[in-house]
């Protein structure tokens, strides 16, 4: 009886601000919450479409969104609704009144940082704490991608984890550990003077999409974006083969400990990504039986044209296969190494 459906109501997101619309609406307790372009959010009566409140974030001059002024969604916890802003901020609003409860700016928007992805609420299975998880955007402008955990009541940062090898993380306001375990990255080259190439200082790897959470293994699982800059020779030793420089931890999927922000595991879909394939598309958690054993896995359809199945307990590659025709950058994924050929 689909042919009998008719519109009950409709609304416009508004005049000159009606730009790209990429948000997934939330419906909670009879209210629809939906974000829109230019860092706006609307609350509407689900039955009548009546606009209950609107919050329009005051954006400064100099914001640098790469790919239109979009927002990809909000999250709800308790009496608050959370969403990111194009000036590298995140805002908590009272979900009934739309009044600001708190707002935080996590990085410098003039450097190219923004936030477009929907945040995620998780409960750390070890500590019992509820955490607000969000990433940064801005790979195209050469920023270091970062994942954050916050106290949803106050907005205070709990930890921050950069997704470029050798960059330092934070825990409880103090430096914690470098990503990859060392300040001497092995997958980023050095120049003729023995210094890390300029590209490393920017790096990319932004986790701009929403995270998944595996309660059983207590792991945040999220995609890491493309390395920066796009120019692969900037991320490769002079005269060398790009395939020798993977540029970790970009263009892959990352398992993160919610208690500490430490990287538990990483699998890279596209080493030294030169095509902006990124690795941010959603990671679906599922289980299947293999020889009587239950395998806990992630499923990921990457923009590089291959579908990946990865063990979500340790990040080990299980299988990868093409799901589109006309792939030219690689012939297949090596079944033993998990690397493109």
What residue spans do the PLM features occupy?
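Extracytoplasmic beta-rich repeat domains
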Residues: 10-26, 54-75, 103-121, 141, ...
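Short coil/turn segments that connect the beta-strands within blades of beta-propeller domains
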Residues: 29-31, 78-79, 124, 129-130, ...
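Residue position within the beta-strands of beta-propeller blades
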Residues: 32-34, 83, 132-135, 222, ...
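Short glycine/acidic-enriched loop and turn motifs that connect beta-strands
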Residues: 39-40, 89, 138-142, 227-230
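Short loop/turn segments that connect beta-strands within beta-propeller blades
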Residues: 45-48, 94-97, 152-154, 258-260, ...
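Short, solvent-exposed loop/turn segments at conserved positions within beta-propeller repeat blades
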Residues: 86, 140-143, 238-249, 300-303
């Amino acid at each position: 009886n689909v042919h009998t459906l008719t519109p009950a109501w409709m609304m416009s997101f508004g005049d000159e601000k009606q730009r790209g619309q990429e948000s997934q609406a939330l419906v909670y307790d009879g209210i629809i919450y939906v974000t829109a372009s230019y860092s706006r959010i609307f609350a509407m009566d689900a039955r009548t479409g009546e606009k209950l409140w609107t919050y329009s974030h005051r954006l400064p001059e100099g914001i640098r969104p790469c790919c239109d002024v979009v927002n990809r969604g909000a999250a709800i916890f308790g009496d608050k609704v959370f969403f990111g802003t194009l000036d590298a901020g995140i805002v908590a609003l009272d979900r009934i009144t739309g009044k600001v409860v708190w707002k935080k700016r996590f990085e410098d928007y003039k450097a190219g940082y923004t936030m477009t992805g929907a945040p995620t609420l998780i409960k750390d299975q070890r500590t019992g704490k509820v955490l607000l998880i969000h990433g940064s955007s801005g790979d195209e402008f050469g920023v270091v991608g970062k994942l954050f955990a916050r106290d949803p009541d106050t907005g205070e940062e709990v930890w921050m984890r950069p997704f470029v090898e050798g960059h330092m993380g934070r825990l409880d306001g103090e430096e914690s550990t470098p990503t990859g375990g060392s300040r001497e990255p092995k997958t980023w080259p050095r120049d003729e003077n023995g210094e890390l190439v300029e590209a490393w200082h920017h790096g990319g790897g932004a986790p701009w999409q929403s995270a998944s959470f595996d309660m059983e293994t207590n792991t945040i699982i999220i995609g890491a974006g493309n390395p920066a800059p796009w120019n692969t020779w900037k991320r490769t030793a002079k005269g060398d083969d790009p395939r020798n420089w993977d540029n970790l931890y970009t263009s892959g999927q990352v398992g993160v400990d919610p208690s500490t922000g430490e990287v538990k595991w990483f699998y890279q879909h596209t080493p030294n990504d030169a095509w902006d394939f990124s690795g941010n598309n959603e990671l679906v958690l599922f289980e299947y039986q293999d020889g009587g054993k239950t395998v806990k896995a992630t499923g990921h359809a990457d923009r590089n044209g291959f579908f990946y199945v990865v063990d979500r307990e340790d990040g080990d590659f299980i299988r990868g296969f093409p799901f589109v025709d006309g792939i030219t950058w690689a012939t297949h994924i090596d079944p033993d190494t998990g690397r493109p050929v």
